[in-house]
Structure formats: structure tokens, C-alpha cells
From Swiss-Prot:
This is Putative vomeronasal receptor-like protein 4. Keywords: Cell membrane, Disulfide bond, G-protein coupled receptor, Membrane, Pheromone response, Receptor, Transducer, Transmembrane, Transmembrane helix. It is a multi-pass membrane protein. It comes from Homo sapiens (Human). Expressed in olfactory nerve. Disulfide bonds join C86-C173. Residues 41-48, 119-135, 205-208 are cytoplasmic. The keyword Membrane applies. It is found in: Cell membrane.
Length: 208
């Protein structure tokens, strides 16, 4: 058992950590680039806001994922209450995943609108303002927080004795058994979100 844990740790350290480090570094560079560009030009287009928002989401997504995967990072995070720690990190990670899907969809749609010809029905959307884009981004945050809020009730730190009914999340966090209603509602909301936004993404990419 100890050898298995050691092997798993080595695999994670040698494979996952470099990918996370590169991803966070690349997205930080993109975020800073767009911030400096806006500071220089003082003009913020709807597509610029979306492009700036996406690397921020990816940074948070990778960071929370790294904490969940790494025992060292999880234990070093300065919160003594493991229950609160599990809930916050898992909740943020799932919200970031959903917001990433929504923001990527928005970016794809905005790009399709930008390159659409004047005869296209998308022409009337070319004058969309940055306020509309900001409104959609805020909506995507609220939507995904609503979809994911059940995790705040069911995520718990690893108990001393792990029952067969608990669902493994990480070495430190497990999911309590859900009722059929909770489980079905959570699944339906996630599937609907993914189908709608990924579907719009595919349609707009095909249009472009």
C-alpha cells in the first residue's frame, strides 16, 4: 500500500505538476498581456473582456485542481478546518470548470459575430457592448454557483473509517451519499449546461 502511494505521488509530481506550472504561467502571461494592452489603449471591446476573463478562470481552475491533487498543497493551505477547506476548494474547482465552458462558448460566439458578413443575421449583434458581455460573464458565474452549490452540503473531509457508500474525490475529500432526487437534479443541470453551451460553441465554430 505504501509503495503504491509513493508511486502515485511520483507520477503526479513528475507528470501533473509541470503541466499545471506551465498552464498557470502561460495563462498568467496572457492575462497580464491583455491588462497592459487595455491600460495602454484605454479601449475594451467585448471580445477583449472575454479573452481576458478566460485565462483568469484557467489559472483558478488549475490552482484549485493542483491543491486537490497534491497532499502537500492541500495540507499547507492555511485553513485549519478540513471540512471547510474541502468544500471551498472542490466548489471553486467545479465552478471554474463550468465558467470556463460558458466563457469559451461566449468567445466562440463573439468571434463568429465579428467575422460574419453584413448579410448575415448575426450582423445586428455586431454592436453589442462590453456591458452585455460583462452581464453574460456575471450570469455564467451565478449559474454555475447555483448548479454546484449542492457540493457545499455533501463534500466532507476523509473520515477515519471510509464506508463503501462514500464517493472518492481526493485523498482528503469525499462525497456523502446523495438522495436520488439530489443526484438526478445535479446530473440534469450539469448535462443541460454542457449540452447548451458546448452546442452553441460547435455551431458558432462551424459558422465561422
Amino acid at each position: 500500500m505504501e509503495m503504491t502511494k509513493l508511486f502515485s505521488y511520483i507520477v503526479i509530481k513528475n507528470v501533473y505538476y509541470p503541466q499545471v506550472s506551465f498552464g498557470i504561467s502561460a495563462n498568467t502571461f496572457l492575462l497580464l498581456f491583455h491588462i497592459f494592452t487595455f491600460a495602454y489603449t484605454h479601449r475594451l471591446k467585448p471580445i477583449d473582456m472575454t479573452i481576458s476573463h478566460l485565462p483568469l478562470i484557467h489559472i483558478l481552475l488549475l490552482f484549485t485542481q493542483a491543491i486537490l491533487v497534491s497532499s502537500d498543497l492541500f495540507e499547507s493551505w492555511n485553513i485549519q478546518n478540513n471540512d471547510l477547506k474541502c468544500k471551498i476548494i472542490t466548489f471553486l474547482n467545479r465552478v471554474m470548470r463550468g465558467v470556463s465552458i460558458c466563457t469559451t462558448c461566449l468567445l466562440s460566439v463573439l468571434q463568429a459575430i465579428t467575422i460574419s458578413p453584413s448579410t448575415s443575421f448575426l450582423e445586428k449583434f455586431k454592436h453589442i457592448s462590453a456591458n452585455h458581455t460583462l452581464g453574460f460573464i456575471l450570469f455564467s458565474w451565478v449559474l454555475n454557483m447555483f448548479i454546484t452549490n449542492n457540493l457545499l452540503l455533501f463534500i466532507v473531509p476523509t473520515p477515519n473509517r471510509i464506508g463503501a457508500s462514500l464517493l472518492f474525490v481526493t485523498e482528503h475529500c469525499y462525497v456523502l451519499p446523495m438522495s436520488y432526487t439530489h443526484r438526478s437534479l445535479f446530473f440534469i443541470l450539469m448535462v443541460l449546461r454542457d449540452v447548451i453551451f458546448i452546442g452553441l460553441m460547435v455551431l458558432s465554430s462551424g459558422y465561422g
